[in-house]
Amino acid sequence: MGSLQTPTNLSNKSCLCVSGRVVKGLRVERQVGLGFSWLLKGRRNRKVQSLCVTSSVSDGSSIAENKNVSEGLLLGAERDGSGSVVGFQLIPHSVAGDATMVESHDIVANDRDDLSEDTEEMEETPIKLTFNIIFVTAEAAPYSKTGGLGDVCGSLPMALAARGHRVMVVSPRYLNGGPSDEKYANAVDLDVRATVHCFGDAQEVAFYHEYRAGVDWVFVDHSSYCRPGTPYGDIYGAFGDNQFRFTLLSHAACEAPLVLPLGGFTYGEKCLFLANDWHAALVPLLLAAKYRPYGVYKDARSIVAIHNIAHQGVEPAVTYNNLGLPPQWYGAVEWIFPTWARAHALDTGETVNVLKGAIAVADRILTVSQGYSWEITTPEGGYGLHELLSSRQSVLNGITNGIDVNDWNPSTDEHIASHYSINDLSGKVQCKTDLQKELGLPIRPDCPLIGFIGRLDYQKGVDIILSAIPELMQNDVQVVMLGSGEKQYEDWMRHTENLFKDKFRAWVGFNVPVSHRITAGCDILLMPSRFEPCGLNQLYAMRYGTIPIVHSTGGLRDTVKDFNPYAQEGIGEGTGWTFSPLTSEKLLDTLKLAIGTYTEHKSSWEGLMRRGMGRDYSWENAAIQYEQVFTWAFIDPPYVR
């Protein structure tokens, strides 16, 4: 391995991270996006102090030494001995420095020749590719979470790190003055500052770091992330400066691999950026428009991951100048609304759409299920981007999200009344009767108990359940619904509980332990979503032996296999029921099939339970599929060079 050179403007202090731990003191200043003439002015032939870390090939040990080098300035980036970039700015350059790098590579080559002689007769073993992966995300559990995005970016990085990859997650450091601030208690200030030029001003950001579960969790610190509310808004709605907040995140994330000496080494230039949803969609654009023209990140790749295409980061066209992109790149993000969607006759419909830009320039595109990857190429599911996505279908893939199999495990779950497993289902009955008792329902182990867990809104199909309840209540069943959302649905749930006191229970709000108990105690889980990119509740349900009934859409269609009692020589196959079209009549028909199977065919029902519990929806399984897409990304040259 060649020598690794840290940024040239280091002080004599030190702040290297060793095995994820930080020694405080070093301050590294980075100027991002400065003009050529500004950086040249008054900085020619200066003396700089640099720290070289030369790695030993044989044992991985490192030797650090200080060198005073008289260097001229060239446009580009400072590079370490292996050719990786250390900070994007005008860099010192010297013939002597280049010669040193060549010599170090020659030494490595000689060492390799010696090693090859000693190992000629050794059997060749397959080499597993490993990657430097940078997740860029608006949320990552347990630090920040509002939905599935937080789950993915909190769990998938750890699964990839466990498989040998070097993984960094870059997200904002949200502080709202409440108990949630404690989640960042172990994050240490790296004392590294980057100056980002966007929105017509220079913004300084800091970086905090925690090394946990093999992952470098990096948090971008700025005053715009310090306010009450969620990552996106408060009780009054979405924050008006979200475009600014996530533009800042994207710029900072692009600098992080170059300037943060995590574990003593920067991630360097050859890495893979995984930009999640519109909040991070500017990253592929910055790589293509701002960095690669100057030879920086020429070996990097970018993947945009679409968790919900309904959210695209659309803003007025006049805000383009705020993004920090060159003027000639406007066409990449230009988005014009159709005439019928404009506010008035003089409205040109012209906007900027950063997700559109990411789809246009990223090396590959991912969604959170195979079904959703197809749906977003249709006019019904693409939200205006279907034609662009169809044009890039050759690099579009879907990978089903995993679940935390430790947190969601019926044999160890601390929230449920009795533990059970695929080999011993007896504890599930105890979970059911305990749930009935907790909710104040008649304790009836043989009565089908139907559950719903989710947001109370149109997308989740709550109106379909509302229409079906009067007829469903005529059957011998019990129903429990947990969720919050639109007031009309919350009021309807309370009213329905008063009408059917022995059959219906409403829990308005959200409670994690209760969601576990409903998942374990119910026999059937309803998910009549209009669209569902992936969905997690159906995966939790199957792991707990609860049978999902879902609308045939997106990830629901991918993960729930229809029950066929006649397959496998009468043993049956499938893990639940899907239905389409999305109507209350079709939902009721499917429920009647399920209830009939539950009451009259116990062995078939037990088979459904065991097959669902036996499915592998772990993050490790998902990580293997992500590795394949990463490999494909590096087979081809960058899509935009």
Curated annotation (Swiss-Prot):
Induction: Constant expression in light and darkness.
CDD domains with a match to the protein in the record: GT5_Glycogen_synthase_DULL1-like
GO cellular component, as recorded: amyloplast; chloroplast
Catalytic activity: [(1->4)-alpha-D-glucosyl](n) + ADP-alpha-D-glucose = [(1->4)-alpha-D-glucosyl](n+1) + ADP + H(+)
Disulfide topology: none
SUPFAM superfamilies assigned to the protein according to its UniProt record, in alphabetical order: UDP-Glycosyltransferase/glycogen phosphorylase
Matches recorded under PANTHER family: ALPHA AMYLASE DOMAIN-CONTAINING PROTEIN (PTHR45825:SF11), GRANULE-BOUND STARCH SYNTHASE 1, CHLOROPLASTIC/AMYLOPLASTIC (PTHR45825)
Protein's name in the database: Soluble starch synthase 1, chloroplastic/amyloplastic
Organism: Solanum tuberosum (Potato)
Lineage: Eukaryota, Viridiplantae, Streptophyta, Embryophyta, Tracheophyta
